[in-house]
Amino acid sequence: HVIANPVQQLYAKLGLIDAQGSIGIFTITPSEGAMIAADVASKAANINIGFVDRFNGSLLITGDVAAVEAAMQDVIYTLCTYMGFAPTNVTKT
């Protein structure tokens, strides 16, 4: 999911102290997919890794809307094409 224009308070609540711009949210099963997604996303676009949890598969990325969306699409493409993950649609608010 992409949060295109989060309120400032949300960054603090998520522990994203120096973050700005959009937030991209992943929850990936199996959880090691989050580590792969973080690597792919960071190489796909000018984003920052806000949080990655290798135990529950959570990944938060931040950056401008276009970069976050591009990174998310590249992650989905990579996981589905090369690793057999089921595709999903990226939602946005």
Question: Positions of the model-derived regions?
Answer:
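Short amphipathic alpha-helix segments
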Residues: 28-45
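Short glycine-/aliphatic-rich beta-strand segments at the starts of folded cytosolic domains
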Residues: 10-29
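Short, flexible turn/loop "capping" segments at secondary-structure junctions
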Residues: 17-18, 51-53
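C-terminal binding/interaction regions
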Residues: 43-48, 54-93
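Catalytic cores of large soluble enzymes that bind and process phosphate-bearing ligands
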Residues: 2, 25-33, 63, 67
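Short, glycine/acidic-enriched capping/hinge loops at junctions between secondary-structure elements
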Residues: 12-14, 38, 72
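N-proximal short alpha-helices
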Residues: 7-14, 44-48
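C-terminal low-complexity, charged extensions that often adopt amphipathic alpha-helices
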Residues: 1-11, 87-93
